């Protein structure tokens, strides 16, 4: 039985640090909180944590040598549909996990500068501390789903409830107040079967606009603060879209398994697809992509529609340069599960500042 309640709050422990001098924030602020996840007081399993799902896939017999440094390439927060565990990777190994038990799917995950982990699990959004305490929880109503969230400062979260109709919402986690609620267009407002595939990602940009990939309606729409459409780009099955620092938009087309960078004038300025990869490196369901500060793009390859025994043959992520050179292949089914998304913790920027991270 799924336990449902609209809001549940817990009061986190607040630790104040006093600085003797003011200065610019660190280039990669999340690196300073990673030690909390391996502290002696962190339990192996949190009181509200779900049981880990058994790994029922076989380990690949022989993994060829791949470009890059494997798990040591980036410290990252990693999650994927089909295996409900969030992995924290640091110094080339998994150092912390959070499992949600069976049911639903994890599609979006964030580490905040206070060390908290914010994530969606199809029927709820949750925030947990490195010490595995749940400090905020929001269950969506029956018949709706949630696949995307974004921190807006430390006290607010943007999410989209797939439903009839779907709704973009901004919730104040401290007060429980719904500060923004706006219905979005949908292919149907009466057919429950259309709820699940409506949205997988929506992001607020640095300018306060909303970038919405309509997965079923084959378009990406940017809305201003009053929800007036100001830019539209048509593309099959856009799973995710992110506004880049250069003003372009990076879009993931799940149907055609490609990632495309589009200018404000809707001109394609860069594209990466399966044909750009060397033999033996095969992408499956591309769902998300992230542009790194060094200009590289990381593309995640999920396992949707595959059998368990096929999973170990699927590449989980690749990192490519602007000129399409392959510099990293993530292929590690011994330590990780399927890949939908990851947040790279060595990237500059503040996660709860919209637009700081290109993800």
Give the predicted meaning of each segment.
Residues 9-19:
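Bacterial N-terminal signal peptides
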Residues 1-11:
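Bacterial N-terminal signal peptides that target proteins for export
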Residues 23-359:
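Histidine-/acidic-rich catalytic cores in large beta-rich domains
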